[in-house]
Amino acid sequence: MDIYQDTQQVLINNSETCYKDFVTKLIPNCSNILGVRIPFLRKIANKICQNNWQSYISHNPIFLEETLLQAIIIGKKSQNISDFNNIKNFIPKITNWAICDTFCSSLKFIKNNKDYCLIFLKPYLSSSKEFELRFGLVILLNYFIEEKYLPLIFKTLDSFKNNQYYAQMAAAWLLSSCFIKFPNRTLIYLKKSQLDKTTYNKSIQKIIESQQVDRSFHPLLKSMKQ
């Protein structure tokens, strides 16, 4: 058996029906779930990273967990600009929010390659495809919420024109995260933003629901809903 087939059998052997049922409820329209927990996937990823990991990520995955495993492996093995090619090749495999968000959170090397990353992200931040756009927005959320990047984030959000749910939720999540760290700057942006009504209201709601936002902002935020 090769590394892909061998790993697939390990995943099947460590799947849990109850966890599969739980994940199925969280990820609509995803029928290829085994029910393997993320900590176990990370453990398997560590082993694959010591062997022929390039071969493993080259396969077209069948199960959700195989895609998540590839995402984690790419994150672990990415160290410099040349590794953005693996990221580019993986992005078409992002078909739901769980793959997207797991992948983005795994790409920690971006912290040291921000300038190049912004160039790389440009086509995704203007993409009409739901999960390409979500990928770009969640990368901004994970690695670029700093004062010097706020103008870029706000400009990106003002050009946001997408009515697909998971893209809109990513935009709202990004804006609420900006508010947590920079409430006054983000409040100024909200008052003059060009966001569509749905994304704007989702952003306000996520800010209000956050436990990290001072409740003193709530009356004003509620009054700003459209």
Regions inferred by a protein language model and the residue ranges of each:
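Alpha-helical scaffold domains
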Residues: 1-226
